[in-house]
């Protein structure tokens, strides 16, 4: 859903993509928070993926933040280690695919979190399209 207008994103907008070799560093990865749940073996990583300026311009986006909460049982990985592994798997999937779009980035996150130590993945996105 477009967070500015409240309209649903069409399939055409979600699948609209750009070749990965046309844009340098298309995605920014940021870890917002790492939580250890008390009395459990659960660690929660809050990861944000942002589209860079050139990718947003190619896809006619004003803003694109994809926020994920990854609930894991992996207690050994620190936030920076997990982010590096997560980033590597997302970019590996996109490199193999060759096209970056909103749906392909979400599919790549599904690929990166399809591990035995991941219990849940919660998504919250902030996407705004250009009007003009």
From Swiss-Prot:
Transcription among keywords: no
Family matches, as Pfam families: Gemini_AL3
InterPro entries, alphabetized: Gemini_AL3
Highest taxon, organism lineage: Viruses
Tagged with keyword Protein transport: no
Keywords: Host-virus interaction
One GO term (biological process): viral process
Functional description taken from the UniProt entry: Increases viral DNA accumulation. Enhances infectivity and symptom expression.
Family: Belongs to the geminiviridae replication enhancer protein family.
Subunit structure: Homooligomer. Interacts with the replication-associated protein (REP). Interacts with host proliferating cell nuclear antigen (PCNA). Interacts with host retinoblastoma-related protein 1 (RBR1), and may thereby deregulate the host cell cycle. Oligomerization and interaction with PCNA are necessary for optimal replication enhancement.
Protein name: Replication enhancer protein
Species: Potato yellow mosaic virus (isolate Venezuela)
């Amino acid at each position: 859903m477009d967070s500015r207008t409240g309209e649903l994103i069409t399939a055409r907008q979600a699948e609209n993509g750009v070749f990965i070799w046309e844009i340098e560093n298309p995605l920014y990865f940021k870890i917002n928070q790492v939580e250890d749940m008390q009395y459990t073996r659960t660690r929660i990583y809050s990861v944000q993926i942002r589209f860079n300026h050139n990718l947003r311009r190619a896809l006619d986006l004003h803003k694109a933040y994809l926020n994920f909460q990854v609930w894991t049982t992996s207690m050994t990985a620190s936030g920076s280690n997990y982010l590096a592994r997560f980033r590597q798997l997302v970019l590996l999937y996109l490199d193999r695919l060759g096209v970056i779009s909103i749906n392909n980035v979400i599919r790549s996150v599904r690929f990166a979190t399809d591990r035995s130590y991941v219990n849940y993945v919660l998504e919250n996105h902030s996407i705004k399209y250009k009007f003009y």
